[in-house]
Amino acid sequence: MSNIPSELKYASSHEWVRNEGDGTFTVGITEHAQELLGDMVFVELPEVGDEVDAGEECAVAESVKAASDIYAPIGGEIVAINEELEDAPETVNTDAFGDGWLFRIKASDESELENLLNAEDYANTIDED
């Protein structure tokens, strides 16, 4: 069973969102998603300054098995990316909820967070997979 931290919010497309408390939100892919993908070989991240809409493709995770689009769980401006992943994409596998984060977004409308799942609801969606 995948680890699903209760303090995070989740998109049904397997991204997680952590509120940093300053109007920005850190985004990554869930442990479940990285388990499905397998060993990461490359992560393509958005550019700092990019504006994204909720549900928009904004990054790509490439593994030994497949390339998978990553969607913005909320809309806003990309304010930081995890540059460490350029040289160490496998960090997504080893620490999906920590050092394997992908990007940070300044939310344009925090009410979009209400459309995301809590840990229990996300767990129920992956149980159905």
UniProtKB/Swiss-Prot annotation:
GO cellular component, as recorded: cytosol; glycine cleavage complex
A Pfam family matched in the record: GCV_H
N6-lipoyllysine, modified sites: K65
Cofactor(s) named in the record: (R)-lipoate
Lineage top rank: taxon: Bacteria
Cofactor-binding details, from the entry: Binds 1 lipoyl cofactor covalently.
Keyword tRNA processing carried by entry: no
Biological process, per Gene Ontology: glycine decarboxylation via glycine cleavage system
Keywords: Lipoyl
Record domain Lipoyl-binding: where: 24-106
Family note: Belongs to the GcvH family.
Task performed by this protein: The glycine cleavage system catalyzes the degradation of glycine. The H protein shuttles the methylamine group of glycine from the P protein to the T protein.
Subunit structure: The glycine cleavage system is composed of four proteins: P, T, L and H.
Name of protein: Glycine cleavage system H protein
Lineage: Bacteria, Pseudomonadati, Pseudomonadota, Gammaproteobacteria, Alteromonadales
